[in-house]
């Protein structure tokens, strides 16, 4: 079994908020959005562990960017060790699960390959829906005295969450496009090398055949009779 890697929660930094909003900064819906690209050698297996809260939505997307066959075995297990997803010889996949408290394990297995390493990209997206309702309630105690503003605190929260959601989706799409571009570029470079190799082989064969033809034609016109003295 390969190395085990723990993926920590990212830290969300909030800046430039009015003082009245700072105590309620926890009201934003916490989310995780991270990606990772690594090389998995032939005959090896790599596992990652992600700690999860209760009643969260975890989305895992992976792609094989480079390597013969562009395929990999994928395994996702719950904190109790129950297999949630098991795929064999896949080039990509997307899976979403509702989580419970504990460490989720997901592995990429390249043991079926003896000579070809694989370049793998995966992305994790966690939407912690379990705490959203309580956090929205926590905001209400900061509403008093904010009516003097042109916008109420609920309106500010709604606008910020909307912007945050759209920025998150934009970042997710850009990450996927970069992954697609990397895989397509690797395929094109592989095709380019293959075309160059066989073009060189074809050129060598043509030169050899031409030389043989010239030799055979020349031999037809040679006078093989021996002159007597």
Swiss-Prot record:
Tagged with keyword Transferase: no
Alphabetized UniProt keyword annotations: Endoplasmic reticulum, Golgi apparatus, Membrane, Protein transport, Signal, Transmembrane, Transmembrane helix, Transport
InterPro entries cross-referenced by the UniProt entry: Emp24-like, GOLD_dom, GOLD_dom_sf
Transmembrane spans: 197-217
Ranges in the topological domain labelled Lumenal: 28-196
Membrane topology: Single-pass type I membrane protein
Domain GOLD: 45-126
Cytoplasmic topological domain: 218-229
GO biological process: endoplasmic reticulum to Golgi vesicle-mediated transport; Golgi ribbon formation; intracellular protein transport
Compartments where located: Endoplasmic reticulum membrane; Golgi apparatus, cis-Golgi network membrane; Endoplasmic reticulum-Golgi intermediate compartment membrane
Signal peptide: 1-27
SUPFAM superfamilies: Supernatant protein factor (SPF), C-terminal domain
Keyword Cell membrane found: no
GO terms under cellular component: cis-Golgi network; COPII-coated ER to Golgi transport vesicle; endoplasmic reticulum; endoplasmic reticulum exit site; endoplasmic reticulum membrane; endoplasmic reticulum-Golgi intermediate compartment; endoplasmic reticulum-Golgi intermediate compartment membrane; Golgi apparatus
Function recorded in the entry: Potential role in vesicular protein trafficking, mainly in the early secretory pathway. Required for the maintenance of the Golgi apparatus; involved in protein exchange between Golgi stacks during assembly. Probably not required for COPI-vesicle-mediated retrograde transport.
Family named by the database record: Belongs to the EMP24/GP25L family.
PANTHER family hit by this protein: TRANSMEMBRANE EMP24 DOMAIN-CONTAINING PROTEIN (PTHR22811)
Subunit composition and interactions: Interacts with TMED9 and TMED10.
Protein name: Transmembrane emp24 domain-containing protein 5
Organism listed in the record: Homo sapiens
